[in-house]
Curated annotation (Swiss-Prot):
The keyword 4Fe-4S does not apply. NADPH binds at T7, G8, S9, I10, G31, K32, N33, N113, E115, G187. 1-deoxy-D-xylulose 5-phosphate binds at K114, S134, E135, S158, H181, S194, N199, K200, E203. Its EC number is 1.1.1.267. This is 1-deoxy-D-xylulose 5-phosphate reductoisomerase. Keywords: Isoprene biosynthesis, Manganese, Metal-binding, NADP, Oxidoreductase. Catalyzes the NADPH-dependent rearrangement and reduction of 1-deoxy-D-xylulose-5-phosphate (DXP) to 2-C-methyl-D-erythritol 4-phosphate (MEP). InterPro entries: DXP_reductoisomerase, DXP_reductoisomerase_C, DXP_reductoisomerase_N, DXPR_C, DXPR_C_sf, NAD(P)-bd_dom_sf. Its cofactor is Mg(2+); Mn(2+). The keyword Protein biosynthesis does not apply. It catalyses: 2-C-methyl-D-erythritol 4-phosphate + NADP(+) = 1-deoxy-D-xylulose 5-phosphate + NADPH + H(+). Belongs to the DXR family. Mn(2+) binds at D133, E135, E203.
C-alpha cells in the first residue's frame, strides 16, 4: 500500500496496522517531519518516498528509495506505484490532487483527507473510497443491515475544547486553548476544527456524498465520544454504533476489512461505565457556524468556500494574528458572500480556481 501523510496521527496509526496485518509499504510521503520519515524508511523499506520541500532533501535518508518532491512529485509517485491501495492522510486541500490521481489510476482510496470530499465530493468515484473517520465508519457499519430502510443519518460530536467555556470568553480564545481536546489525540488542524464545529460541517458534507443526498442528515453532541453514529429507520427505530475513541478501528477497516474483522484493534467497551451517555443538541449560540449546516446541505458545492476560508483563517489563528472569534468571523463572511452564487465546478481545475479565489479574497480580512 501507499501511505500519504505518513508522519501525521493517521499515518502513524496506519503504519502500525499495516505492520500488524503484514502489508508491504510501497511508498511514503510527508510534509516537514523528515526525522520521523527517516525512521519509517528504516522500518518499512519503501521503494518510493515523497517530501514536500526541496530544501529538506539533504536531511532525507531514502536508503535507495526513489525520491519525489512537492505536490507534483506526489502525483508522479502515485502514477508509478503498483499498489492497489492508497491511504491519503495529507492535511488540507493539498491532498485533493492526490485523491484524484489515485482514483484516476483505479486504486482503492482509504481517505482521511476530509477536504477531498468537502471540496469535490461531486467529482469523485465514491464506490472506490473508504472514509477513515469514526463517524462514517459507524454509519457504514449500521447501513450493512439491508432489511431496514434508513430515514436519517446522525453523527456525533464531542463539543471540542470550548464546550464548557462561558460564551462571552469564546471569541477571545487562542490556539493553545483550542488544542486541548477533551477526548481525542489528533493533529492541530482537526482539533481546532472540532472546537469551531467546522469538523462536523465537513463530516455532514462527507455523509451527504458518501451515504445519501436523499436522507436527512444531522449531528448531536455526545461528550464521551463513545457513540459515533446513529441511523433512524422508516419504522422509527434507531440503531447506534458504539466503540472506544480510537482511530485504529476505522483505519484497520479501510486498509483490510477482512483482517480487521478477525482481530481487535481497540480496547473493549465497559458497558457498566456507559451510564453517563447523553445526547445534547448543538447550540448555535455556542457554535455559531452550525447555523450554516442546512445551507451547506442545500448547496454542498459551498464546501469549497467553507474549506478555503477555514484554512486561511486557521493559518492566521495558529500564527496568533487573530483570536478564535476572528476565525469564526472569516468563515461566516466567506459563506455569506458566496451563498447566492451558482456553482458549476465541473472539473478539478474549477474547484482549485474557486479555492484560490476564496483564499485571496479572505486572507486579509481583519479578525477579532
Amino acid at each position: 500500500m501507499v501511505v500519504l501523510g505518513s508522519t501525521g496521527s493517521i499515518g502513524k496509526n496506519a503504519l502500525k496496522i499495516a505492520k500488524k496485518f503484514g502489508i508491504e509499504i510501497e511508498a511514503l510521503s510527508c510534509g516537514k517531519n523528515i526525522a520521523l520519515i527517516n525512521e519509517q524508511i528504516q522500518v518499512f523499506k519503501p521503494k518510493k518516498v515523497a517530501i514536500l520541500d526541496p530544501s529538506d532533501l539533504n536531511d532525507l535518508e531514502p536508503l535507495g528509495a526513489e525520491v519525489f518532491v512537492g505536490l507534483e512529485g506526489i502525483d508522479a509517485m502515485i502514477e508509478e506505484c503498483t499498489s492497489n491501495l492508497v491511504l491519503n492522510a495529507i492535511v488540507g486541500v493539498a491532498g485533493l490532487k492526490a485523491s484524484f490521481k489515485s482514483l484516476q489510476r483505479n486504486k482503492k482510496l482509504a481517505l482521511a483527507n476530509k477536504e477531498s470530499l468537502v471540496s469535490a465530493g461531486h467529482l469523485l468515484d465514491i464506490s472506490q473510497i473508504t472514509p477513515i473517520d469514526s463517524e462514517h465508519f459507524g454509519l457504514w457499519a449500521l447501513l450493512q443491515n439491508k432489511t431496514l430502510k434508513p430515514k436519517s443519518l446522525i453523527i456525533s460530536a464531542s463539543g471540542g475544547a470550548f464546550r464548557d467555556t462561558p460564551l462571552e470568553f469564546i471569541p477571545i480564545q487562542n490556539a493553545q486553548n483550542a488544542l486541548k481536546h477533551p477526548n481525542w489525540s489528533m493533529g492541530s488542524k482537526i482539533t481546532i476544527d472540532s472546537a469551531s464545529m467546522v469538523n462536523k460541517l465537513f463530516e455532514i458534507l462527507e455523509t451527504y456524498w458518501l451515504f445519501g443526498a436523499s436522507l436527512k442528515i444531522d449531528a448531536l453532541i455526545e461528550r464521551s465520544s463513545i457513540v459515533h453514529a446513529l441511523v433512524e429507520f422508516e419504522d422509527n427505530s434507531i440503531i447506534a454504533h458504539l466503540a472506544s475513541a480510537d482511530m485504529q478501528l476505522p483505519i484497520s477497516y479501510a486498509i483490510d476489512p477482512k483482517l480487521a474483522s478477525l482481530s481487535a484493534s481497540i480496547k473493549p467497551l465497559d458497558l457498566y461505565a456507559l451510564s453517563a451517555i447523553k445526547f445534547e443538541p448543538i447550540s448555535m449560540e455556542r457554535y455559531t457556524l452550525w447555523c450554516y449546516k442546512d445551507l451547506l446541505l442545500e448547496n454542498p458545492k459551498l464546501g469549497v468556500v467553507l474549506n478555503a476560508s477555514n484554512e486561511v483563517a486557521m493559518e492566521k489563528f495558529l500564527n496568533k494574528e487573530i483570536a478564535f472569534g476572528g476565525l469564526i468571523q472569516t468563515i461566516s463572511q466567506a459563506l455569506e458572500s458566496y451563498d447566492k452564487m451558482p456553482f458549476k465546478l465541473s472539473s478539478l481545475e474549477e474547484v482549485l480556481e474557486l479555492d484560490k479565489e476564496v483564499r485571496e479574497r479572505f486572507k486579509n480580512v481583519a479578525g477579532v
